[in-house]
Amino acid sequence: MDTNNNIEKEILALAKQKVSPIEYENCLSQLKYNPNASKSDIAFFYAPNTLLCNWITAKYGTLLKEILSQNKVGMHLAHSVDVRIEVAPKIQISTQSNINYKATKMSVKDSYTFENFVVGSCNNTVYEIAKKVAQSDTPPYNPVLFYGGTGLGKTHILNAIGNHALEKHKKVVLVTSEDFLTDFLKHLDNKTMDSFKAKYRHCDFFLLDDAQFLQGKPKLEEEFFHTFNELHANSKQIVLISDRSPKNIAGLEDRLKSRFEWGITAKVMPPDLETKLSIVKQKCQLNQIILPEEVMEYIAQHISDNIRQMEGAIIKISVNANLMNASIDLNLAKTVLEDLQKDHAEGSSLENILLAVAQSLNLKSSEIKVSSRQKNVALARKLVVYFARLYTPNPTLSLAQFLDLKDHSSISKMYSSVKKMLEEEKSPFILSLREEIKNRLNELNDKKTAFNSSE
């Protein structure tokens, strides 16, 4: 037996001692150690599917990290070890030559395609733009920037573009801004920048995820600026993904903001109920998990718009049913998902509410704090009041001061205005906007909680 198999067996044996036999059999036993990707400070594992990958990461990621950090298990490990779990790649038989093939599909995940992307009224525009870009021999728009909240399918659509381009034998580079930075620093230290430039500038499709993280890194922004210019000048397709629109990426150089807006910018909206139900059904089908119709409807209605959280809900129900040897019904689902339905927006600060509203409406926070006749600013101010009344203990006086309102009675009017749009008029736009702002608040509050717990 080779060393890598020994390492995998030793890791799993240690993990088996920490969990119940059923948990080990259903979850951890299916992990495969990936020696090629692993390094001294990071260990990579494969899981057989996306649902199990996400579940093990959330439920057992910390446990695996502790095991690897405290035991050598045949590896030359650093003091602190990170753990990454990915979906196992499908083995494909190539019908073409192998010349530079690995370089042409850098980091593209073949499980994300146009065929398994669930299309609804919330994302149809983004889907059509992405398909046109992927199918065209020359860029129809350049660059393309898709933006929106976490877990709405942006990364899926980016990989779908990459996979379609690969089918046409195009050279594709898909990278996160974090990995772009890491690679940049490595080549800079090794004085091999010519190799770095060749890697990222000689491709047909350059696909960048998390573009907002370029900001605040002058040397990286400078290199990306020149990479962008050369790709654009040579009519190579550039597609960017961000969690906010270019003008709202604080700290990003103006010249990059300008270039991001050269082509077309489209927002990925939160899914409506019908689309959410379609997503839940698809995730169940792909991972061979059978849920009753009423349970799938319950997930769509009560779990947030974040697709990853919906996946997590499906996994949680399935795994708990297996552990308890129980049949899946609505009562089980309600019990298992109780903690996922808690509103993390409770106790939000005024600053977080302001930021969440600003990001959702593509405004700057400073614009919202000043009274304006512009419709989008006026709506934003009303939404800040609405969410502040829902989620903060701040009295009317402090809220009025926060928004520079001289007439404190305006607070009640602004709150009532939003409530009317939601409850009486049932404006689809305002309803969708409310969910997006809540999702952003959840993310901001979760980040704060994680930061505080690490102190």
From Swiss-Prot:
Region spans: Domain II: 75-106
Transmembrane annotation, as ranges: none
CDD domains: AAA (cd00009), Bac_DnaA_C (cd06571)
GO molecular function: ATP binding; ATP hydrolysis activity; DNA replication origin binding; lipid binding
Chain spans, region Domain III, AAA+ region: 107-321
Keywords from the UniProt entry: ATP-binding, Cytoplasm, DNA replication, DNA-binding, Lipid-binding, Nucleotide-binding
Residues engaged in binding ATP: G151, G153, K154, T155
Cited PROSITE patterns: DNAA (PS01008)
Region of interest: Domain I, interacts with DnaA modulators: 1-75
Record InterPro entries: AAA+_ATPase (IPR003593), Chromosome_initiator_DnaA (IPR001957), Chromosome_initiator_DnaA-like (IPR020591), Chromosome_initiator_DnaA_CS (IPR018312), DnaA_C (IPR013159), DnaA_dom (IPR013317), DnaA_N_sf (IPR038454), P-loop_NTPase (IPR027417)
Principal subcellular localisation of the protein: cytoplasm
KW Manganese (keyword) present: no
SUPFAM superfamilies: P-loop containing nucleoside triphosphate hydrolases, TrpR-like
Region (Domain IV, binds dsDNA): 322-455
Annotated compartments: Cytoplasm
One GO cellular component term: cytoplasm
Swiss-Prot/TrEMBL GO biological process terms: DNA replication initiation; regulation of DNA replication
Summary of subunit composition and partner proteins: Oligomerizes as a right-handed, spiral filament on DNA at oriC.
Family: Belongs to the DnaA family.
Comment field on protein domains: Domain I is involved in oligomerization and binding regulators, domain II is flexibile and of varying length in different bacteria, domain III forms the AAA+ region, while domain IV binds dsDNA.
Free-text function comment from the UniProt entry: Plays an essential role in the initiation and regulation of chromosomal replication. ATP-DnaA binds to the origin of replication (oriC) to initiate formation of the DNA replication initiation complex once per cell cycle. Binds the DnaA box (a 9 base pair repeat at the origin) and separates the double-stranded (ds)DNA. Forms a right-handed helical filament on oriC DNA; dsDNA binds to the exterior of the filament while single-stranded (ss)DNA is stabiized in the filament's interior.
Listed name of the protein: Chromosomal replication initiator protein DnaA
Gene: dnaA
